[in-house]
Amino acid sequence: KNSLLKYSEQYTTQKKIQRPSDDPTVAVRSLKLRTTYSQLTQYAEKNVKDAMSWMNTTETALSNISKKFDNMKSYLNQGANDYLKADDRKSVLTTLQQYVNSIFEDEANTDYSGRYVFTGYRTDTSLLFPENTDKLSYQIKENFSYDSFDNITVITGGANYDSTIANGQQYTDKTAKKNEVYQLRLAYDNCSKDAFAQAGTNGTSIAISFTYKDQTTGKDTTEVYAAAGYNGTPAAKGNIITRSSTDTNAYEVGDNEIVYLYDTGEVLVGKTKYADIQTKQADFSVTYVKNDFEKNDIRPEMYFKCTAYDSVNNKTTDYADPSDQEIEYEINYSQNIIVNTQAKDAISTDIYRMVDYISKTVKYVDEVETKIDEVDKMISNTTDKDKLATLNSLKTSLETERDLRSKVMTDAFGMGLTMIDEAGQKVSVATSELGAKYNRAQLTYNKLLDEQTDSEDKLSENEDVSLT
């Protein structure tokens, strides 16, 4: 009778046992197999899929950035190889700015299921400021190497119409001249000329710390150059001159001088100081202050070690160097995979800073061409020989300035091409590393599916009644 009942229950349920006491061995094995199957399902259907989706979202953004770089190259080529008329310059520049905005706003700020994919551990914080803010002040530490400088040509001087000038030679004497300087662009413009006001900081608007190996002693040596007010350690070896780019002597740099243009975020060094940096192959950090941020500016803590001060809440926050903020997923037993790529490792801030520089060179060409047009109108409206001679001298001087500034502008477009190649290489490396991790996750996923099937077969063999 018991056997008949047992077989009847097995036939109805198609299971070998109905309760653990029917066969403890089968019951224990079933528990282990079900636990294994549940874990495999968690890995395959949740962990690995989430990891692959995160990486796929990142890869899509990086791929879109690469495509936008390719599109930008054609416009940069136009500016580098052709003399563009004013309307064409405006069109090219506007297009470049739109691409840069799209790269950061649409791609670098992307998220997966509400988590920002390029912001390291701070997945709940956007890469960019969502709105203008004047309540935050940052002291930012940005690292560079000795080869980070650009050799650029700057135009100084230049003639302007002056109704009191009657001698054309006076305009000739004011003709613009070109100078070469070594330029370092910081990640931000519109920086502060004032010190970071919080206690424990270095008491100045900018300080540069050079580190190199002393050729005599073989020891690592640090030299600091700073603007007025510096009270850090070690003591400053030299001074940094602070100016605005609108100062008449903004780009006049002595051979051994360092000049900081706070409004454009530029550091300029003279040729002797530059040669010294190159000889020593000095790595260096620049610590500077920025007070106000516009909507879609990059949050400094996503790229740099920095200190933030919230003036509304009177709160100071120290942010460590954001390197190596790795987010890991467990995708199999004792097998983890890093799913995230940080913006600082893939998307260079040089992109928008270079377009800022191009914009400035275009602006200067536009301004001098406007001056020439105004002089042409004055020439056409007078028959006075002396005045014509004076105006023609002014025009000649302005045309010289236009030619000089046009060369600087085309060089800037050419530098943009080089920058895009370098930034594109950075994206390419990040994409390749991401692709390798994605392929590993895909192999793990396929293996998990096989193990799931095998686990199902073993579970069925252990639990199910064979009706054949």
Locate each region found by the language model.
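Amphipathic alpha-helical coiled-coil/heptad-repeat segments
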Residues: 74-221, 268-270, 294-353
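Polar, low-complexity export/assembly segments characteristic of proteins
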Residues: 4, 8-11, 15, 120, ...
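The ATP-binding site of the protein kinase catalytic domain
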Residues: 2-10, 15, 198-201, 207-225, ...
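Surface-exposed intrinsically disordered loops and tails
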Residues: 163-165, 227-252, 310-317, 389-406
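Intrinsic low-complexity, intrinsically disordered segments enriched in polar/basic residues
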Residues: 28, 49, 211, 221-222, ...
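Amphipathic alpha-helical polymerization modules
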Residues: 1-130, 389, 396-468
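Signature of Asx- and small-polar-rich beta-strand/turn repeats characteristic
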Residues: 215-286
